[in-house]
Amino acid sequence: MREFRWYLRMLAEVHHGRERHMGNTHDWLQLQKQAHREFALRLAAVTDWEAPTPDTDWNVRDLVRHVVEEQQWVPQLLAGRTLAQAKRELAPLGHDLVAEWGLYSFAATEAWDAAAPDALVTLSYDRVSVTDYLREQVSDVAIHSWDLARAIGAPEELDRFLVEAVWTVFEPQRDTLAASGLYAPPVPLPDDAPLQSRLLAITGRDDRLAA
């Protein structure tokens, strides 16, 4: 019941949070909730867990497991634990990934809401601020929401404010991302292409291709 009340509160906050979005200022806590809502909507529509995804090494099950596992880490790292300490606290995921998503999405959101924005978090590559970690996590869930939508044939359009915010994270790093090997090569698109298409293109995704 507590989780259900929280979910209703999250949806209401996302709706009202849009009214507070102005210019280049982004309320990343609201965007985290919106990103999780985007993913949850697609997850609820999954019927074929073996379907391929735009992440060519993953099927739908693998993709969902990755996103859920990322949420498992959030409360541990925000509590100040090292990677080794956090890893010891992580439980293996169960077979019901929809239920696991609900559990760990809730826990992650509660942890984000309670975290001090300027506190430092130990990640695999550096110590960063809570705010930087939050932006990274919002961006990851947003992109994978599109991946999941494409994989299952669900609506692919993401929330406009979410896309605009993630663009401010990825666009300044386009050269770094291209050189990282984490993504396929960027897809060339004209400057007047939709912002979501250009965002996806930075990560090597081409939404013009047939699903």
Give residue spans per PLM region.
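A conserved catalytic-loop motif detector
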Residues: 68, 98
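Structured surface interface patches that mediate subunit assembly and partner/cofactor docking
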Residues: 3-17, 21-31, 35-56, 73-93, ...
